[in-house]
């Protein structure tokens, strides 16, 4: 089997722009170049029409009203606008916020910033499977709690939280509920009405759209208020000033339209690839799947291989584009904070690979990846004195290493 290498298996970091999306974008860079805010001539009207069509397509994927979609530069900005915007608007009602230890840095660092501004944040832990305990969430809610932020699907381990149940808890107590859905859109059904979500962050480049464009869903009924974080010409109903990049918005709209249309077949494709990969690595000993396999986006596998050094593993499989830890932070050699939150030890957290499949991934590529990983794990373990000791039945935890 000849597979063109390197094989891209890092679709949770970014996706290719679908050819249909790129084609749709090009005219808005050349011919239809007007500013959508120019309402006195045809160039502006045409651009505005394209923006509104995209807004409707994005809203359709998440079952929202187009008027509830606010364009941003991506999910990081959407997270910032949602969390800071809501916290600043509702701070007279209370200054307590709740989130989860395994959230994306865009949420965690925003929360840290609000702590510096005098807000109090509760960081919920997760169970071994990566899911939060709903009873723990209920217990954390106080009279002065104004916002809960929980991601739909985790960027590292792909675990899907019980968002409708959390939405129910928040709605009952009149608490604003924000969801980072960057990794969920186009991979699992997303319905803001059914899940009682107030604010939802989205990104185009995780859904075969262009980078640098995202959106924030802001509920109108019951209305959720935000304080703007970007000031200027009052674009996007005052929520987010700045000239709209028509070509990127058109790209995001088309990407979300295709995602809605092809969701079922995409999900089936991902499941098939996941099963092929799992079957391919079946024989390897001391393999740990990180995160719940049931409650999970179908295109994500995060696997730890005991007695293998993470960095040497990445180097050994250089024919594969995969990541260890989250791409935003994989430049640091710190073990993944998400895996640590699951209770994984440093060794297992270090030896993890995140393998994420995409629309363009083939069965042959996945077969190749599984076989390559299997053979490299074998070779690396042959070199490992720890593996040898483990195979000899020595309990490595009982060894007292000499301090140098």
UniProtKB/Swiss-Prot annotation:
The active site is at residue 328. GO terms for cellular component: L-cysteine desulfurase complex. Keywords: 2Fe-2S, Cytoplasm, Iron, Iron-sulfur, Metal-binding, Pyridoxal phosphate, Transferase. The keyword Iron-sulfur applies. It is found in: Cytoplasm. Pfam families: Aminotran_5. One of its GO terms (biological process) is [2Fe-2S] cluster assembly. Its cofactor is pyridoxal 5'-phosphate. The modification N6-(pyridoxal phosphate)lysine is found at residue 206. InterPro entries: Aminotrans_V_dom, Aminotrans_V_PyrdxlP_BS, Cys_deSase_IscS, Cysteine_dSase, PyrdxlP-dep_Trfase, PyrdxlP-dep_Trfase_major, PyrdxlP-dep_Trfase_small. Pyridoxal 5'-phosphate binds at residues 75-76, 155, 183, 203-205, 243. GO terms for molecular function: 2 iron, 2 sulfur cluster binding; cysteine desulfurase activity; metal ion binding; pyridoxal phosphate binding. It catalyses: (sulfur carrier)-H + L-cysteine = (sulfur carrier)-SH + L-alanine. Pathway: Cofactor biosynthesis; iron-sulfur cluster biosynthesis. Its EC number is 2.8.1.7. [2Fe-2S] cluster binds at residue 328. Its main location: cytoplasm. Homodimer. Forms a heterotetramer with IscU, interacts with other sulfur acceptors. Master enzyme that delivers sulfur to a number of partners involved in Fe-S cluster assembly, tRNA modification or cofactor biosynthesis. Catalyzes the removal of elemental sulfur atoms from cysteine to produce alanine. Functions as a sulfur delivery protein for Fe-S cluster synthesis onto IscU, an Fe-S scaffold assembly protein, as well as other S acceptor proteins. HAMAP family: Cys_desulf_IscS. NCBIfam families: IscS, PRK14012.1. Belongs to the class-V pyridoxal-phosphate-dependent aminotransferase family. NifS/IscS subfamily. This is Cysteine desulfurase IscS. It comes from Neisseria meningitidis serogroup A / serotype 4A (strain DSM 15465 / Z2491).
